[in-house]
Amino acid sequence: VNLLQIGYRTLKTAVAAALAMWIAEQLKLDYYVFAAIIAILSIQSTRKKTFRSSYERIMASLLAIVLGFILFEVIGYRPVTLLIYFILFLPSVQRLRLQDGFITSVVILTHLYTERQLNAHILLNESLLLGIGVGVGLLVNMYMPSLDLLIDDRREKIDQRIAALFFEVAAAIETGRVNHHALTLDETERLLHEGKDAALKRMGNAIGRRNDDEDYAYFRMREQQFELLRGIVHHAEELVLVVEEGKKVADFFRTIGDNVRPEADAMVYISELEALLTRFRASALPVTREEFEVRSALLHMLQEAEQYLRLKQRYVNQKK
């Protein structure tokens, strides 16, 4: 089997399960296979999720032991005790937000039920199983491949696709012929999702840091800009003829395309756009219905371009 074809998370899960079970077996613990199950459950998509799920597993297991011991001592080791246990335990883990520990705690309870007692040996056995499973899971899941190259690649490609869309829109305004934008739009949307997911995952792996990330802010900004750009492309498809004002609008969109990089200050282009809108509104009224529709579409495109630029400027200001 080609190891490169196996997902790193699958590989980590297999290693954690085997290692946890081997340690528990070497210690001659009862139900040593349970350590492997805990280790498997501890492998999460990010380090922060792993720590959170491990915490929930430990706390839910402690609650299960205490509640189980009380009920078994009062009612006895009978099926009705399990019924009462679940009626009490389920709402408790939900209220305490310990849902990830539910399966682990149920297995521990079945061990107590099978043994029909709770003594120091059983308590130590269950504690070691839990500690080994959680500990191995945490240790193995500390390895997370770097996402920096993926994020940088998606940022570069997104900038290129957005610039290409502005150039295509400019060409459509000047010629009245619409290129097929759907593939570029779909690809840009896919790149945005991949980049944003990668940035979120990297934030989840950053232990001890705040939940902020410049790359995540970039993808959020581009995501909002993309929706505006989609509207601009839609209006470009409504252009049925070439009008005189279109040349200046096309030149302006090319300027935006040439300066699409996120760190570029947008205020100068916002001022240029406002001047263009003023001249646009002051120009002579359209003569034909087709000319009116084209100028209306151009006006909407400029208004959406203004929102696009203001989103960019807000992003630049937040970085300062």
Where are the regions that the model predicts?
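A transmembrane helix-and-boundary motif of multi-pass membrane transporters/channels
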Residues: V1-L183
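Short coil/turn segments at secondary-structure junctions
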Residues: N2-L3, R209, R289
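Long, contiguous hydrophobic alpha-helical segments, chiefly transmembrane helices and signal peptides
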Residues: L41-S42, G101-S105, L109-H111, A199, ...
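Short alpha-helical linear motifs
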Residues: I58-A64, Y77-P79, H111, L129-G133, ...
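C-terminal membrane-adjacent module
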Residues: P145-V243
